[in-house]
Amino acid sequence: MVEVEHWNTLRLRIYIGENDRWEGKPLYKAIVEKLREMGIAGATVYRGIYGFGKKSRIHSSDVLRLSTDLPIVIEVVDRGHNIEKAVNVIKPMIKDGMITVEPTIVLWVGSKEEIKKFEEDAIAERR
């Protein structure tokens, strides 16, 4: 049985296009680099193989329908206050996209030292 404790963690998702840019570099790279500089717990970039956005135009990795602007999703899970800071920094970088934030429960997988540090930080955060 797994014990679940609320650690005030949030999941941030950033939906952008593969061709979106920030200061001459791919936007997804600029965002991940900024998150890393901020000390965010981690970020993962997913490249969509098929989808559409608000303009209802299909984007596909299919050879017969090769799109040069596939959907990109950047996903981050961290403590609530870190996600809030990240959103405030990233929002001005996005000209055409979407940001979502939702509560999530972390069932931590890691070393005992990492888990203990995470728990201590979460307890201190509640005070």
Swiss-Prot record:
For this protein, the record's SUPFAM superfamilies field holds: GlnB-like (SSF54913)
Q: Which Pfam families does the record associate with it?
A: DUF190
Which top-level group of life is the source organism from?
Archaea
- InterPro entries documented for this protein: N-reg_PII-like_a/b, N-reg_PII/ATP_PRibTrfase_C, UPF0166
UniProt cross-references to PANTHER family, sorted A to Z: UPF0166 PROTEIN TM_0021
The UniProt family comment states:
Belongs to the UPF0166 family.
What is the designated name of this protein? UPF0166 protein PYRAB06660
